[in-house]
Amino acid sequence: MDKRATKQVLITGGAGYVGQVLLDGLPNNWKATVIDNVYGGNNNFHPSENIKFVEGDIRNESLMEKLIAENDAVIHLAGIVGDSCPNNPKSAQKINVDATEKIAKFCNQAGKRLVFMSTCSVYGFNEKTCNEETEPNPLNAYSNHKVLGENIIKDNSDNYLIFRMGTVYGWSPRMRFDLGINLFIEKSLWKEEIHVYGGNQWRPVIHVKDAAQALVMAVEDSTLNTTLNLVGKNHLILDLAKQISDNIKVVDYKDDNRSYKVDNSRILEKLKWRPIMDINSAKSEFQKVNYQEDIYYNKRWNYE
């Protein structure tokens, strides 16, 4: 039995892709409260003795203030991602930016630790390897919101850790196939052709289990107040596809100019975190599902 003091942790967006993997590996001494509005539906989330579920919206200020006061730390995962931001501009601003500001202020007022999930997409396009001191260059609404969120937290919180997460992949109870590597692997199971758009763009990648482990470590080490790149190795997108399948078609694509390599030396040194998963180990987790269903694609949901 784990005899460490019980830690109460609030997880926003905890019924989502990263959140459910985090909950699957919850430390024995943690009791989690999940707040999630389960956009798009989710039949795979199951509360337990150590996991309390609150179906609610992070824009509800009185609810958020109450939940934050009841917990020791907050892991802030909730947000509108990717193409859903320009498709739902009003909600994206209120959820990604305005609600994040309130959460940061409530955490600071109550003396709670805040762990925020940002994205390496804030680097946009950069031919040099980016570290945490590299000037952000957001090229879309989502990454711009994350830059704003980071700045808000640094301005309003005394006890925080910001992760800039790389391109995430891996199996989750709340699966997503609007993530490129996941779609590549799933299509390979069905023996289908993989379309690679461009392919010469660089991406730092991170398995969702490794990301979840970093979140746990960020809460446990409450002395570390900084920004960390949460990434494993850097890959060209075409090279990633070739690791997964031989059935590849390269498609000319100019709508996404992002390309960035990212240095992870700070997280290795400061948090003592190490990634353990890779593309090959991820492939064994996948199962054949109807990957074209709307539930697997956040951008198909209406948030307004």
Which residue stretches match the model-derived regions?
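C-terminal substrate-binding subdomain of Rossmann-fold SDR/epimerase-dehydratase oxidoreductases
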Residues: 192, 197-304
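Flexible, glycine-rich beta-alpha linker
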Residues: 123-124, 140, 163-179
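Conserved beta-loop-beta element that borders a ligand/cofactor-binding pocket
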Residues: 119, 150-172
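NAD(P)-cofactor binding segment of oxidoreductase domains
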Residues: 74, 87-114
